[in-house]
UniProtKB/Swiss-Prot annotation:
PROSITE patterns: PROTEASOME_BETA_2 (PS51476). It comes from Dechloromonas aromatica (strain RCB). Protease subunit of a proteasome-like degradation complex believed to be a general protein degrading machinery. Allosterically activated by HslU binding. This is ATP-dependent protease subunit HslV. The active site is at T7. Transmembrane segments: none annotated. Keywords: Allosteric enzyme, Cytoplasm, Hydrolase, Metal-binding, Protease, Sodium, Threonine protease. Belongs to the peptidase T1B family. HslV subfamily.
Length: 178
């Protein structure tokens, strides 16, 4: 069976603002199946931003589990992320899920992986997915050399990634916490 490919999710933090955006392309093999997928969402009454890279069904399962952890831990992002990662690593069914999450609140940005890792990247930039390294490079250059707001850095960086990565398009979803 062919694998779903694609996605670029980027989160940038500057000052009291964090923005997260993602493209809308879903690819099966060398065919674009959907160009308008929504891979970035608000969770926990709009206080948490979350984006996914990987299998769509797997990601929705993880979103559901992550929201349950947020409810259980009163919106504590770090604790919820660690608890989800523990479950993901130890639960036989969850271990088969092929996705990665990028999550952020007003204080912290994290990557949660299926290996049980919870990572807080440096410089306030989180990038995942096939176009993640392109978007991360662009975001870092813009963050270090301009005064652009996170929203604008994410938009411009996703445009650049969309021009380079064949699994990334320019149909973005963007969410901001200020």
């Amino acid at each position: 069976m062919e694998q779903y490919h694609g996605t670029t999710i980027l989160s940038v933090r500057r000052g009291n603002s964090v923005a997260m955006g993602g493209d809308g392309q879903v690819t099966l093999g060398n065919i674009v199946i959907k160009a308008t997928a929504r891979k970035v969402r608000r969770l926990y009454n709009g206080r948490i931003l979350a984006g996914f890279a990987g299998g769509t069904a797997d990601a929705f399962t993880l979103f559901e589990r992550f929201e349950a952890k947020l409810d259980k831990h009163q919106g504590n992002l770090l604790r919820s992320a660690v608890e989800l990662a523990k479950d993901w690593r130890s639960d036989r069914a969850l271990r088969r899920l092929e996705a990665m999450l990028s999550v952020a609140d007003r204080e912290v940005s994290l990557i949660i992986t299926g290996n049980g890792d919870v990572l807080e990247p440096e410089q306030g930039i989180v990038a995942i997915g096939s176009g993640g390294s392109y978007a991360q490079s662009a975001a870092r250059a813009l963050l270090e050399n301009t005064e652009l707001a996170p929203r604008d850095i994410v938009t411009k960086s996703l445009e650049i990634a969309g021009d380079i990565c064949i699994y990334t398009n320019r149909n973005f979803t963007l969410e901001v916490l200020e």
